[in-house]
Swiss-Prot record:
<dbReference type="GO" id="GO:0051539">
    <property type="term" value="F:4 iron, 4 sulfur cluster binding"/>
</dbReference>
<keyword id="KW-0472">Membrane</keyword>
<feature type="binding site">
    <location>
        <position position="68"/>
    </location>
    <ligand>
        <name>[4Fe-4S] cluster</name>
    </ligand>
</feature>
<dbReference type="GO" id="GO:0008137">
    <property type="term" value="F:NADH dehydrogenase (ubiquinone) activity"/>
</dbReference>
<dbReference type="GO" id="GO:0005506">
    <property type="term" value="F:iron ion binding"/>
</dbReference>
<protein>
    <recommendedName>
        <fullName>NADH-quinone oxidoreductase subunit B</fullName>
        <ecNumber>7.1.1.-</ecNumber>
    </recommendedName>
</protein>
<feature type="binding site">
    <location>
        <position position="67"/>
    </location>
    <ligand>
        <name>[4Fe-4S] cluster</name>
    </ligand>
</feature>
<comment type="similarity">
    <text>Belongs to the complex I 20 kDa subunit family.</text>
</comment>
<keyword id="KW-0520">NAD</keyword>
<keyword id="KW-0813">Transport</keyword>
<dbReference type="Pfam" id="PF01058">
    <property type="entry name" value="Oxidored_q6"/>
</dbReference>
<comment type="function">
    <text>NDH-1 shuttles electrons from NADH, via FMN and iron-sulfur (Fe-S) centers, to quinones in the respiratory chain. The immediate electron acceptor for the enzyme in this species is believed to be ubiquinone. Couples the redox reaction to proton translocation (for every two electrons transferred, four hydrogen ions are translocated across the cytoplasmic membrane), and thus conserves the redox energy in a proton gradient.</text>
</comment>
<feature type="binding site">
    <location>
        <position position="133"/>
    </location>
    <ligand>
        <name>[4Fe-4S] cluster</name>
    </ligand>
</feature>
<keyword id="KW-0479">Metal-binding</keyword>
<dbReference type="GO" id="GO:0048038">
    <property type="term" value="F:quinone binding"/>
</dbReference>
<feature type="binding site">
    <location>
        <position position="162"/>
    </location>
    <ligand>
        <name>[4Fe-4S] cluster</name>
    </ligand>
</feature>
<keyword id="KW-1003">Cell membrane</keyword>
Length: 224
């Protein structure tokens, strides 16, 4: 499995993500082959324990911009009960949040505000882009709308739809939890390599490609 290694470089030159540099590397667990069995297993167990705590206690920092935010907060009702995934604690401060949900249309004047709030979040942190407007600008192909929040933020999970249903938001949480469980982050600022290994997430479109092609009886528009 290929992993994406993200290095923090404050002095690096990168137009898109000034504080990060990403590259595709091999599985970091292969490095344990050249080390002692005891230390390799111990470090692996520590990573699994830390990731278990992170993925089951995700506190969202909501940044609602339009109608997608209404669908997001619907998942907090008793019908959907997002508390099952440990992500029901909405934070009003970015310093107390684990991931940011950009739900809705991002205007050019709002982009610096979102980026500054993202920079105020403590590591580790993740970003979910919710809705067509946040993903690619949606139907607003105009100078005043940013054509996708990934123009200035590193997005981890994209949620398609206009607007997406609350079930789509909860599925994005599950995908994010699965990705966090496979991450390899520094256990300390003096222990191990100071980089973040993230498994490359396959899109749901590609993952279900065979299932989509195998469908012969398509549903009518009234049944969708």
């Amino acid at each position: 499995m290929d992993y994406t290694l993200t290095r923090i470089e404050p002095d690096g030159e990168n137009d898109r993500y000034p504080l990060q540099r990403q590259e595709i590397v091999s599985d970091p667990l292969e490095q344990h082959v050249h080390r002692s069995v005891y230390m390799g297993k111990l470090e692996h167990a520590l990573h699994d324990t830390v990731n278990w705590g992170r993925q089951n206690s995700l506190w969202p920092y909501n940044f609602g911009l339009s109608c997608c935010y209404v669908e997001m907060v619907t998942s907090f009702t008793a019908v959907h009960d997002v508390a099952r995934f440990g992500a029901e604690v909405l934070r009003a401060s970015p310093r107390q949040a684990d991931f940011m949900v950009v739900a809705g249309t991002c205007f050019t004047k709002m982009a610096p505000v979102i980026q500054r709030l993202y920079e105020q979040m403590l590591e580790p942190k993740w970003v979910i882009s919710m809705g067509a407007c946040a993903n690619s600008g949606g139907m607003y192909d105009i100078y005043s709308v940013v054509q996708g929040v990934d123009k200035f933020l590193p997005v981890d999970v994209y949620i398609p739809g206009c607007p997406p249903r609350p079930e789509a938001y909860m599925q994005a949480l599950l995908l994010l939890k699965e990705s966090i469980g496979k991450e390899r982050r520094p256990l300390s600022w003096v222990v191990g390599e100071q980089g973040v290994y993230r498994a490359n997430m396959q899109s749901e479109r590609e993952r279900k490609r065979g299932e989509r092609i195998a469908v012969t009886n398509l549903r009518s528009p009234d049944e969708i």
